[in-house]
Amino acid sequence: MGGFHRFFHIRMRLRVLYHDHCFDGAASAAFFSRFIRGKIHPDAEFHYTGMAHRASQIFEDSLFDGDENAIVDFKYSNNEKLTWWFDHHQSAFLTPEDALHFQTHPSPKKMFDPSFKSCTNYIRVKAEEIWGFTAPDLDELVYWANIIDGAQYPDPKTAVELGAPAMKLTLVIEGSKGSDTVQRIIRYMQRMPLTEIVAQPDIQDLYRPLYERHVNSMGIIREQADENGGVITFDLTGYDLEGYNKFIPYYLHPEGTYTVAVSPSSFRTKISVGSNPWSPVEPSHNLATICERYGGGGHARVGAISLEPGQVDEARRIAAEIAAELRS
């Protein structure tokens, strides 16, 4: 019996909750996994759960089923089973009580800094600063997470025409159904350069129809979008475009400073609020603060509000209010 116990080994089970259908969310999960395996738990077994913003956002206790549990690039939870947390969104807390819980329960494994352009880079900096972990082979991943999540593209053409492998991968991450594809990509990201990931047959099979959909979405938004007073508005009710490229409006209307769009899906009715990174007029409104008034959030330059499925009329009312405020 002693021999059995000596050789029998149960691997650490680590559950990672990440922002689903988001390049930075996937890259954050990948970098975090490499960090944990490289510095904390070398034999950890990773399980991933994609998280999406919903109107009634709650963290079910059953989500935290690991020996250790992590949330990356997504909102804070006060669940006692949460071990690790990294986020960079201004709107990182569901309630004031959650913010107070974070402040009064300090942990070196739970960190928040909205000054970072990407959560991936935030994890990279803290992993090196505190634990001495580095992964030079993931520098490309961190670089593109900063570009994509921080909207650091040189021009709308780069953001929309998808020339770089990272942009092609973003199309697949944002447009694929369910979470299985994104979770495969998270595992690929830990060991492959982006060019190699995009060349994988399973990714190519998804990319081709998604690219056709991307081209079609440009035509739909061209028809639906209207620019007035520096605000581009459009309503995608009736179209399956939940994962459309958010820079298309500025590609089509470079004179616009902001966008406000309504896009229903199976699990929410979404109001997207964004600002043009290349605008000739400097955006002056904090979009996260505006969205927070309606139960949403985000960053200063980009935010969103999630209502229940079917609340299209309410979404249109809110969108009109926000558009009027942005024109003022």
Each language-model region and where it sits:
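Glycine-rich, Lys/Arg-enriched anion-binding loops that position phosphate/diphosphate groups
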Residues: 152-244
